[in-house]
Amino acid sequence: MVKNKGKKLFSDSIQLEGHQGEINTGKFSHNGEYFCSAGNDKTINIWEVFDKKCQNVNSIIHAHSSPILEIAWSNDDDYIASCSVDKRVTLWDIYNGNYIIKYKEHDNFVYSIDFCDNLICSVGEDCSLIINDIRMKTKSNSYQHKYQLTTCKFSDNNNIFFGGIDNQIYKYDIKKGQIDKNFILIGHNDTITGLDISHNNKYLLSNSMDNSLIIWDIQKTGNNLSKKLMGNKHGPEKNLLRCKWNNDDTLVSCGSADKIVHIWDVKLGCIIKNIYGHNGSVNEVDFNSLVPNIISSVSNDNTSIIGYF
């Protein structure tokens, strides 16, 4: 086990307790210093990762009126955006816990959210992709799909990948205000629940209720499917299980209903590590940018775990 000499956890595995319900989302800040979690108790918790006790430094109680389904950090880590069953997307100041803007453009549950520069994208039950510029109080762009959308991810500040219950992944060009009809990724057999872009911006990772992860080469035209990974599980509760690349794009991980954090070696195409500790579905995982062999996980068991792997 190789640890960063400058930063280290106070224990090899830390269980964070502070939520009173299932945790749906949990992400490290871009600088790796903080961890944010949120879920069915409508609370957003922020933890200082390398503090002697991994201290909870801020709790935003009743951040939404219904369960929170996903959060996203701004590029500078000064803000967090959250989306909820209450149909709202909210932008928060992490230092004082106050909301800055509440966006109310969605007509139903908002399932997924992502942040890039000044833009926030969100998708939901109303079949819409909505893009908000945090410098404005009204939406800057939107796209109406035929089916419910469950996940979205910026690849840069001009393109957004999104997917939903039609099992396909689409690319939306922000400047053109339309999807690329020549770029539709087909390969999953059930709802897409999570997306993540590799750090080199060459590959897209997707998680699906068909119990597979797919790595797509998004620089190719034609057959984009690069590799299919198996081993994760989706349960009858149909949680939106998210997925993640590690810092150097050699490993991937994802949420899994079997209570296990699975880590795949991308080159080998197989699971190289299983991490146990949760008593419920693992809904989201994240790799720490500051110390590459630290991973986080959040679960239906009301806890988050941060530890070395």
Please provide the spans of the model-predicted regions:
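Intrinsically disordered, low-complexity acidic/Ser/Thr/Pro-rich linker and tail segments
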Residues: 1-20, 25
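Canonical WD40 repeat/beta-propeller blade segments in eukaryotic WD-repeat proteins
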Residues: 21-27, 66-73, 108-115, 146-155, ...
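WD40-repeat beta-propellers
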Residues: 44-49, 83, 89-93, 113, ...
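Structured C-terminal portions of repeat-based eukaryotic scaffold domains
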Residues: 177-291
